[in-house]
């Protein structure tokens, strides 16, 4: 698939949220009637080309929900949300991770996956890899296996892929 359709709908916004940062805005991609469908199709093709066959999709709050559900629908699979703390009503696993300034946490229900599940992690952006690594750690607490991670965008100069060494990582658009 030609990824120009996707790349052309990601807008570079200089100096947001602070000077020196170039924010990659996906809202035009989502606003396009074909944007989400084409992104899910491109993700599905990437998985097929690598021989990755998940049994379930996990998406990280919040934009991972958007792309994760679209991909799950395209593949005929279920979807599990990976949430910020305090959003899930039943017993959870929790993993904390470091941000540039401070820390954050993610949670999933303890029974979100079966030990036989082959989980694909979906999110919009791979930057430093902290959120993705925490997501992998959460899934591994359930005894399920992570078969890959896929992102719409990868910011290569932030080396997030290095943090995920040993995992199958894909990104549709790289900057």
Which residues make up each language-model segment?
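Short, hinge-like loop/turn segments at secondary-structure boundaries
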Residues: 74, 96-100, 164-168
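PRPP-dependent phosphoribosyltransferase catalytic core
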Residues: 2, 8, 134-175
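Short glycine-rich phosphate-binding loop at a beta-alpha junction
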Residues: 52-61
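Conserved acidic residues
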Residues: 55, 117, 147
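Active-site-facing substrate-recognition patch
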Residues: 1-53
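Short Gly/Thr/Asp-enriched flexible loops that form oxyanion-binding sites at enzyme active sites
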Residues: 66-75, 136
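Short, glycine/charge-rich flexible loops or terminal/linker lids adjacent to PRPP-binding catalytic cores
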Residues: 80-120
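Conserved G/P- and acidic residue-centered "switch" motifs that form tight phosphate/ATP-binding loops
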Residues: 124, 129
């Amino acid at each position: 698939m030609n990824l120009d359709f996707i790349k052309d709908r990601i807008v570079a916004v200089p100096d947001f949220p602070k000077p020196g940062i170039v924010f990659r805005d996906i809202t035009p991609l989502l606003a396009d009637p074909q944007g989400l469908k084409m992104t899910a199709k491109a993700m599905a093709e990437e998985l097929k080309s690598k021989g990755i066959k998940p049994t379930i999709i996990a998406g990280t709050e919040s934009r991972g929900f958007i792309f994760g559900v679209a991909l799950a629908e395209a593949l005929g699979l279920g979807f599990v949300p990976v949430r910020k703390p305090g959003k899930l009503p039943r017993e959870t696993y929790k993993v904390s991770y470091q941000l540039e300034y401070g820390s954050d946490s993610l949670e999933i229900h303890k029974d979100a996956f079966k030990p036989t599940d082959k989980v694909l992690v979906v999110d919009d952006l791979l930057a430093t890899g902290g959120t993705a690594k925490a997501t992998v750690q959460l899934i591994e607490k359930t005894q399920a296996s992570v078969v890959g991670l896929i992102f719409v965008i990868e910011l290569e100069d932030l080396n997030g892929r290095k943090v995920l060494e040993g995992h199958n990582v894909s990104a549709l658009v790289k900057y």
